[in-house]
């Protein structure tokens, strides 16, 4: 059977390995997952209670207007409901953006190393990819590439902070760059980890209401999978000019997000204590990862996220990842990104200590 020719140029996305699979494969009783940047404290208590109260409604289709969650987000971000679209994870909104803007006759621009799904979704449409030589977000290089190919480039991805490296840009740098982009080119700001960046440094904070007020060609993406601990429910959102959102709705299937996910998301937003606990733990424990890296002469990039990336010269990331798996510790090997590096999610103090103990033995 023949398939779309664009599939010949695609590779499958490699997700983090599952706890149960590793336990069975390696015969370990305790498995610690520090691979997928999930919340180490699990699901917010208010969301858990909400799910309990609504579990008997799983047979019902959701309210397709999603009015409760939209109104909650609109109040949080000081925008209108018409500026918001809800997706089954923010990656579904990425897919909407790509299908709305890209085809085999145009192109997109991204950092040399960034979230893999941008390229996977875009190549499904046959779009050409322009990448910076720098693995991080070098806006001077972005500007040069855009100016050289602006007739082709119709979509730009800025992952802020960047996954899988963790670096971030000041908000003022971002807005200055966007001012040089034509209105017909959509700038997607993937802010999946921006709550972490904003907590660490207010200069990194991106305010969607200000962005869409100043620019008609900006899409701000948020998710409930990281800070809010709802990765398993698959729910995220996009905020943009009403005309952009209206176009995306033509690509959205009805009932694309479950009623339980919608209810839990509202509860999670209102669980301030859980969010505060998560952020404080993240950056206090991050310091221990920096100290460990310094002790072992491991190169890092200052991270504004809930993960840290370790770069190696002599050691091999695949070998290190395999040795950690044998100890029941799952991290993310970044070989598929062309890097001799591993990405580690910041866990609980117990999980992190277990990582330090076992990795210290491996590195000797």
Curated annotation (Swiss-Prot):
Pathway: Amino-acid biosynthesis; L-histidine biosynthesis; L-histidine from 5-phospho-alpha-D-ribose 1-diphosphate: step 7/9
MF annotations from Gene Ontology: histidinol-phosphate transaminase activity; pyridoxal phosphate binding
Catalyzed reactions per annotation: L-histidinol phosphate + 2-oxoglutarate = 3-(imidazol-4-yl)-2-oxopropyl phosphate + L-glutamate
E.C. number(s) listed in UniProt: 2.6.1.9
Highest taxon of source: Bacteria
Cofactor: pyridoxal 5'-phosphate
Gene3D superfamilies: Aspartate Aminotransferase, domain 1 (3.90.1150.10), Type I PLP-dependent aspartate aminotransferase-like (Major domain) (3.40.640.10)
Modified residues (N6-(pyridoxal phosphate)lysine): 226
Top EC category: transferase
Keywords (A to Z) from UniProt: Amino-acid biosynthesis, Aminotransferase, Histidine biosynthesis, Pyridoxal phosphate, Transferase
Swiss-Prot/TrEMBL GO biological process terms: L-histidine biosynthetic process
Subunit field text: Homodimer.
Entry similarity comment: Belongs to the class-II pyridoxal-phosphate-dependent aminotransferase family. Histidinol-phosphate aminotransferase subfamily.
This protein's name: Histidinol-phosphate aminotransferase
